[in-house]
């Protein structure tokens, strides 16, 4: 795929994952991702949606910035008004081996526009009429899924190792 991948820098603890980073380092990562897209697309693309694993969202929402009552997530939301949609997806979690084989949390920053990214289903799930076969009733089903269509791959950015 041609979707750009942003590489996280190690924090003061020597690790790149957000569980090991301070609030300032996480904010710097978000700024770095946004600046990376701006530089890569020469300010043409302006992503407005961020997807992250459920457990990471909860962790950032419950973790307080030292000396304040504000959570890391609320601080990031307040200071990145260009990101309007904050979404969670369990498939991006490092613990979900069915969909995520990297062993790391994944983040996705993208432009929520059906012209730039869409899920194509050429044939929706269809159940045919029940048929008697021998001593059982069989219901044949069919469906087709084309997956994600991303005609503008630079309108999204993947981040591994959150």
What are these regions (language model features)?
Residues 1-12, 38-51, 131-145:
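Long, contiguous amphipathic alpha-helices that act as assembly "spine/axial" helices in icosahedral shell
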Residues 23-43:
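Phosphate-interacting basic helix/loop segments used at nucleotide- and nucleic-acid interfaces
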Residues 50-55, 110-111:
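Short His-Asn-centered micro-motif
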Residues 55-63:
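Short acidic, S/G/P-rich loop/turn micro-motifs used as interaction or catalytic elements
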Residues 62-162:
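Sequence/fold signature of self-assembling virion shell proteins
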């Amino acid at each position: 795929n041609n979707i750009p991948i942003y590489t996280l820098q190690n924090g003061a603890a020597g690790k790149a994952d957000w569980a090991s980073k301070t609030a300032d380092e996480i904010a710097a990562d978000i700024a770095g991702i946004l600046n990376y897209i701006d530089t890569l697309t020469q300010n043409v693309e302006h992503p407005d949606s961020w997807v992250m694993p459920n457990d990471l969202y909860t962790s950032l929402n419950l973790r307080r910035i030292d000396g304040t009552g504000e959570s890391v997530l609320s601080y990031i939301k307040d200071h990145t008004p260009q990101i309007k949609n904050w979404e969670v997806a369990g498939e991006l979690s490092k613990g979900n081996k069915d969909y995520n084989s990297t062993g790391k949390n994944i983040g996705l920053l993208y432009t929520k526009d059906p012209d730039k990214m869409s899920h194509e289903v050429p044939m929706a799930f269809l159940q045919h009429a029940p048929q008697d076969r021998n001593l059982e009733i069989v219901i044949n089903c069919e469906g087709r899924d084309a997956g994600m269509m991303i005609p503008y791959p630079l309108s999204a950015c993947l981040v591994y190792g959150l």
